[in-house]
């Protein structure tokens, strides 16, 4: 049993003061408003419901630092996108799962409890489908399950590359 005490907590009925929350095996067992703090309580100033990250591309977590500094004067979103596609060409489902698991743990540590994962890496680097068409989706789902974050998988399909009905680029065929 774990006992948490909050000076302020946002509960379903609104804000409350002096709230004790008792957890059993990670599940909320009871909530008491207007409580007095006890010696065994772990104290916190504020409690909020878990937040949802509504727009994630977890694999991009591994790119941190690669595009933080602008390059030549002609650098733009499109040059960033080209780098991203070159980067993902080196990833396999195991890489995707490992990177997503790291990103999801970092989200949990930051207060997110759910993630909407925009997932568009469906094929091998050469654009060929995996034997199991859901291979990379299963990797994302395994990462979410391993980390403990709630997942809404949002599969993405590229019919066109940019504007003007251009065929998808090599990176978009993944």
Language-model region placement:
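Histidine-centered catalytic micro-motifs
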Residues: 49-61
């Amino acid at each position: 049993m774990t006992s948490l005490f909050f000076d302020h907590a946002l509960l379903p009925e609104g804000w409350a003061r002096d709230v004790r929350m008792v957890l059993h095996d990670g599940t909320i067992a009871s909530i008491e408003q207007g409580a007095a703090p006890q010696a065994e309580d772990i104290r916190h100033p504020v409690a909020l419901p878990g937040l949802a990250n509504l727009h994630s591309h977890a694999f991009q977590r591994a790119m941190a630092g690669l595009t933080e500094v602008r390059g030549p004067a002609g650098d733009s979103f499109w040059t960033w996108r080209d780098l991203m596609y070159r980067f993902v060409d080196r990833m396999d489902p195991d890489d995707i799962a490992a990177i997503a698991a790291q990103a999801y743990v970092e989200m949990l540590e930051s207060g997110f409890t759910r993630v909407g994962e925009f997932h568009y890496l469906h094929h091998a680097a050469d654009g060929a489908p995996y034997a199991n068409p859901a291979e990379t989706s299963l990797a994302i789902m395994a990462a979410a399950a391993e980390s403990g974050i709630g997942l809404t998988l949002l599969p993405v399909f590229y019919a066109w590359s940019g504007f003007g009905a251009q065929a998808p680029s090599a990176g978009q065929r993944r």
